Regions:
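Terminal targeting signals and extreme-terminal segments of soluble enzymes
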Residues: 1-147
Length: 147
């Protein structure tokens, strides 16, 4: 599967999941860059009407995972046995918003055979930085036994 098809694949596979419930849209997903967007809506807010930190962090984690998946699966097509799992995540929440669309852009810091480290910046519709998230993901190999 060509790398430019991963965004459509993720949007399709997200149907019925928490990702779809939130309204996440995978815009670009390659092994070099993943861009996801999320529109503001009241169900994603905390008590004062701004984005809930969990919604921002979930979007960033989805971007990290998508990029790592594109790396792990390569051109071979969708393989659940190669789907990466976040094992560590660090988030710095810098500001917040109560309107518009937020955008997460993930880039790789390290892509190995068994792990990936991905950095994601989340920005508001005015390109103001909302959060910086770094995640370490384990890359299971196809056919590996889980325990």
């Amino acid at each position: 599967m060509p790398t430019n098809d991963w965004a459509a694949e993720f949007n399709q596979r997200a149907a019925g999941s928490m990702i779809a419930d939130h309204g996440t849209n995978f815009r670009t997903v390659t092994a070099e860059r993943a861009v996801l967007e999320l529109d503001f809506k009241p169900s994603l807010t905390q008590l004062t009407g701004i984005f809930h930190a969990g919604a921002i962090i979930a979007l960033a984690d989805e971007a990290c995972t998508a990029l790592a998946a594109a790396h792990a699966m390569g051109e071979g097509g969708w393989d659940p046995a190669k789907f990466p799992l976040t094992v560590q995540l660090s988030a710095n929440l810098i500001r917040n918003t109560n309107r518009g669309t937020i955008r997460a852009e993930a880039t790789p810091l390290h892509r190995g055979r068994t792990t990936a480290v991905v950095r994601t910046e989340v920005r508001d519709q005015d390109a103001k930085l909302l959060a910086v998230v770094t995640a370490t993901l384990v890359l299971p190999s196809a056919g590996a036994k889980s325990g």
